[in-house]
Amino acid sequence: VITGFGRLGASFAAARFGVTPDIMTLAKGLTNAAVPMGAVLVSGEIFDTFMDGPDNVIELFHGYTYSSHPLACAAGLATLALYEKENLFERAASLESYWQSAVHGLQGLENVIDIRDIGLTAGIEMAPRDGAPGMRGYEALVACFEAGALVRVTGDTIALSPPLIIAETQIDELLTIVASAIENIS
């Protein structure tokens, strides 16, 4: 979900790495999370396997009570059109080196033990506090939120995935807030 719809500078992580998946799930980015919608994409071979089987076996379910809601479909089509019109996937790709440089600028901070990134995503891993794993991450989350930045944490790792429309000045602002949060927790 996080690596789809341009986040890595390509339509999906599979495209960036030259992989052709047999099955792929997608959701939030399909409608920019404005309206709930999800999808399952399958290759022709997988689809045919389900559809060409005996009549008494499980089919590839593709319609439920809430399927094909017109509002969600319209939101999905509009979102896909905007991705293309605004060249957002290409924009993300063009920001990647700036993003990486800015994120790796946090490397020398106390308690930062690893930084991982690709595209417009990053994970800043902090050393766990003795006897309280996850507390540094939680405290960083709270400090960032109080300073106006919404981040996600997993244990003691701050996970960042900014919007595709982020500007370089906003990247600087975000990482200044994250750096301050990390510096102000023990």
Regions found by a protein language model. Name each.
Residues V1-S186:
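Conserved N-terminal phosphate-binding loop of PLP-dependent enzymes in the Aspartate aminotransferase
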